[in-house]
Each structure stands twice: as C-alpha cells, then as structure tokens.
Amino acid sequence: GSEMCIRDRFFTEYYGNPSSVYNFAQKSKMAIEDAREIIADSIGAAKSNEIYFTGGGSESDNWALKSAAFGLRDKGNHIITTKIEHHAILNTCAYLEKNGFEVTYLDVDSEGFVSLEDVENAITDKTILISVMLANNEIGTIEPVCEIGEIAHKHGILFHTDAVQAMCHVPINVTEMNIDLLSASGHKFNGPKGVGFMYMKNTAKLEPFIHGGAQERARRAGTSNVPGIVGMGQAVKLALGTLDKDTHTIINMRNYIVDRILGEIPDVTFDGPCIDADAYVNAVSVGLPMCSLKRLPSNMHFCFKDVSGDSLLIMLDMNGICASSGSACALSLIHI
C-alpha cells in the first residue's frame, strides 16, 4: 500500500545518508524526523526527541534493561519483572543475573494478570527497575501498567514496558500510563521487519547500548535504516487512522470465531481474560483506554483436549488459516 510506496522511494530516489550535510542526504534526515514526530504523537510522548529508532523490539528491550541496570548500579541491583515476558526480557534478565543483579520474577493469575500487591511486596530498597509487558503475545492479557507505573514512581523506580504486541492495536499514552521506557517493533503493525523504536523519557537519560557514531543524538550508533524508519512511521499513521473502526471489526470477528469453536467443538478451553464485547467502547469513552481494556482485541488462545497441536496446525494451514502453537521466538528453538 502507501506505506510501501513511500518506503520504497528511500531505496530508489532518496538514498542519501541522513548523517551527511549535502541536500540530497537532508531529504532522508527530514523523513526520519517526520517519522519520529508521528510516533511520538501516537504514544503521547512529550517531545519527539524521546523516540529512538532501533533494529526492533528485542534491541529496544535489551537497551532498556541493560542500560538501566548498569547505569543505576550505584543505587541498587534489584529488578522486578514477570514470568510471562518475551524472551528478549527474560534472557536479558538472565544475563544481568550472571553479572551481579538480582531479578524477581512475579507469577501471574489464571488469566495472565500480575498482582499489584505482588509488585508492591517485591520492591526493596535496592530495586532500580520494574519491567512488565503491556500486552501478552500468547493469551492477549493487557497488564495493569498504569497502576504498576504509579507504584514504581511512588518508590522512585524506573518503569519499562514491552509494548511490542500492543503498539497500534490499542491506544497508548506514555504520560497518562506512567511509562518511562517503552519498546516497540514495526513488524507488529504492518510496518517493515527489522526496525523498531524505544521511547525514553527525557528524565531517564540511559547510556547508549550500541557505541560508535553520533546517530540518534549519540544514543544509538549506526547508519540509520531510512526506508525502515520511514515505512514504520507511515505504518503507525495508517494503523492509528483506522484503529477504532478496525478494532470493532476485529472484535466482532474474534468473538464470532470464539463462539463457534466453544459452541461446536467439545473439550475446548479458551485461555486468558474473559471477553467483554463492550470493553473497547467503554474504555474509549473514559479517556484512558488502556487502563480499562483487559485483552487484545485480536487475540484468541484455545486448548483442545487429546488433539495433536502439530496435526491441527497442518490441517489449518492446508485450509488457508495461519495459526501457531506458541510465539515465533519460542518456536524457532524447536529447530535448533
């Protein structure tokens, strides 16, 4: 669509290096800054210079956790997260544990929600960072990040959220949601693969993760992926332009499928938060959408008793239905 057309022009016409001073290159630089403005506005960032472009969600997660941990080490060495985070968070935490940090992994309830009381009780005088995903990629649970951010700030603790699964699928406002650091990836909202961003509140001031040149205000070295960044900016613009309409359509389709499967196939369980058909409408009306939503509108997760998952996926695939028995990052481990 239009995202691809605009992106492709920066492969074929405006291919100058945005770090150079000549006019041809400045067209690329202007396009990057336009994308930065679009993304900043889309998540309610106070300033566009709080958006840093990266190679994807995994890099953003690594940057947030490692730079926060090592940068705040003089204040403490304790990090709080959950057991249901993406591998980019869990494996980074494991790395930090090997380097002298202590990590508390919180349990979640049967619907995937982390307890606010558990978050509060896990905090110590050594806690420097709390990282809880905004929305789970397998069962769709939207965590109470607004309240978790409040708890973190009450104790003077930095709060990071992995919003890879949520970006452009539900409304996000980093200011109202008390978020200091946020990770996202373009491929999750019809943007290009291999490009993402991190929101870093100006007061956070994390150290660079990738060292080298002065790109991204000397916070993230490396020649900018201009087509990827421009494409991601356009994808955000397109997705948010039809978010309300698309969400209602998706919710209706999702609920139809859930009702048919649960009503016609025996011994099936629907995992994750219960579906509230009016949740999105009600949430939008109160002005803080995310704090009222419990599940991603597009998410479904079923368990079929006495059925081979691989066989079921093959049959679905043969009928033109794309489904998975786990997250893509976890499935790739099977083939190692």
PLM-predicted stretches and their roles:
Residues 1-3, 7-333:
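Pyridoxal 5′-phosphate
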